[in-house]
Swiss-Prot record:
GO terms for biological process: negative regulation of short-term synaptic potentiation; negative regulation of SNARE complex assembly; neuromuscular process controlling posture; regulation of calcium-dependent activation of synaptic vesicle fusion; synaptic vesicle fusion to presynaptic active zone membrane. Component of the outer core of AMPAR complex. AMPAR complex consists of an inner core made of 4 pore-forming GluA/GRIA proteins (GRIA1, GRIA2, GRIA3 and GRIA4) and 4 major auxiliary subunits arranged in a twofold symmetry. One of the two pairs of distinct binding sites is occupied either by CNIH2, CNIH3 or CACNG2, CACNG3. The other harbors CACNG2, CACNG3, CACNG4, CACNG8 or GSG1L. This inner core of AMPAR complex is complemented by outer core constituents binding directly to the GluA/GRIA proteins at sites distinct from the interaction sites of the inner core constituents. This is Proline-rich transmembrane protein 2. Keywords: Cell membrane, Cell projection, Cytoplasmic vesicle, Membrane, Methylation, Phosphoprotein, Postsynaptic cell membrane, Synapse, Transmembrane, Transmembrane helix. As a component of the outer core of AMPAR complex, may be involved in synaptic transmission in the central nervous system. In hippocampal neurons, in presynaptic terminals, plays an important role in the final steps of neurotransmitter release, possibly by regulating Ca(2+)-sensing. In the cerebellum, may inhibit SNARE complex formation and down-regulate short-term facilitation.
Amino acid sequence: MAASSSEVSEMKGVEDSSNTHSEGPRHSEEGMGPVQVVAENLDQPEALQSGPDTTAAPVDSGPKAELAPETTETPVETPETVQATDLSVNPGEDSKTCPSPKEACQEPASRPEVNREATAEQGAEQQSAAPPEPTSEQALQLNTQSDPQPTSQPPPKPPLQAEPPTQENPTTEVLTESTGEKQENGAVVPLQAGDGEEGPAPQPHSPPSTKTPPANGAPPRVLQKLVEEDRIGRAHGGHPGSPRGSLSRHPSSQLAGPGVEGGEGTQKPRDYIILAILSCFCPMWPVNIVAFAYAVMSRNSLQQGDVDGAQRLGRVAKLLSIVALVGGVLIIIASCVINLGVYK
């Protein structure tokens, strides 16, 4: 019995050394698990009880020791090794202690998986939170620079040039030139006529003048209005140089005839002064004298350019001259008849 007890103590030492060497390969292979460890521990006491031959244990420790360098994981906690030694010492209690090594071995196996999942999730979060690559930003900037939107940045327009001021109406310039007027400080000043010839007459169509507007800055509409007012005043009151206005109350409706300057295709008022002189030889002296006066007035109006007044005065002179002539002839005939009949 003493020899058997010494052998048992030696076997325990060998088993302890073999267990420390076999911890690495036992935990590296997850499929092996604690079940195989328990089976090995149960087989070892049977070998001890069979005989004093102890060569089997060292043979098994060799491969286990060779597998130890291949393991990469750290050895498991010491309580597992303690439990394994307890199982080897007390093989009869394997039914009670088997559940605890399985749970202890399953926990370390599940922990690396949890750690791997946690690291994978952290890596995905870091990749999602990482900023985009600078190459993509540079590509976007190049695209935006190469294709600018026309609506966001329209091309600059050249500044509009100031339009030159509008020129005067050519008709107003023709009127001012024909009547001999001057423009001074935006006002129209008519000139005095040196001769007593007929007044304004329409000028033929002339090309548009290239004169610039007056330097005083008066608008062309004001100048045109002033010219029109001056023309209407002349038609009513005669030429500015005349001593008196015309007897006419309405503006002239007919222009001068071919004999008058500017008259084209219009009827010229006739001069009835000769008829008035003939009527003076008739015995209707008050009538023929008035007819002669109207004939002279009609001639003066025609010389001043008042065609309408000359026509009206000429018609009155004609009527009075005819009345004087007819009346004078009748008086002469009546006197002759009376004188000749009395003498017979």
